[in-house]
């Protein structure tokens, strides 16, 4: 989660397998749905550019790991260029294979996300 908080998209992508997929819940155009590694990187770069610090800080609150699956409850915080504060709660489910993240499911408060990024 530390690498996310720095906003270094290339470093973030280095943790993903070449065929990784990242799914975000909800119906937010440009954010929700399934993305491949390249699409996810483009989305991250775009979102990071909307923040004052160039990143959305992520703080893990609780972890559960079993086999190749890791679930993480997380809180984010960022001051946005539009003057709003992005402070969301997430549940991430990671599937790790051969030392790389292969699949991610991201559950979050979509209404807060929509209000901050699109409102």
What are these regions (language model features)?
Residues 1-19:
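Short acidic-aromatic low-complexity motifs
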Residues 17-68:
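A solvent-exposed, acidic/Ser-Thr-rich amphipathic alpha-helical stretch
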Residues 56-58, 73, 86-91:
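Short, surface-exposed coil-to-beta transition loops
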Residues 67-76:
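A short hydrophobic beta-strand element
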Residues 76-78, 96:
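Hydrophobic beta-strand positions in extracellular immunoglobulin-like domains
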Residues 78-85:
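Short, cysteine-centered beta-strand-loop-beta hairpins and adjacent loop/turn segments enriched
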Residues 92-115:
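Short beta-strand edge/turn micro-motifs at domain boundaries
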């Amino acid at each position: 989660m530390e690498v996310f908080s720095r906003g270094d998209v290339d470093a973030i992508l280095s943790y993903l397998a070449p065929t990784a997929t990242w799914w975000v819940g909800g119906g937010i155009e440009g954010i929700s749905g399934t993305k491949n590694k390249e699409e996810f990187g483009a989305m991250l770069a775009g979102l990071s550019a909307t923040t004052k610090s160039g990143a959305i800080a992520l703080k893990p609150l609780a972890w559960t790991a079993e086999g190749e699956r890791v679930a993480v409850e997380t809180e984010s915080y960022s001051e946005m260029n539009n003057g709003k504060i992005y402070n969301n709660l997430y549940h991430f489910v990671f599937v790790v294979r051969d030392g790389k993240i292969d699949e991610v499911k991201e559950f979050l408060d979509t209404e807060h996300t929509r209000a901050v990024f699109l409102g």
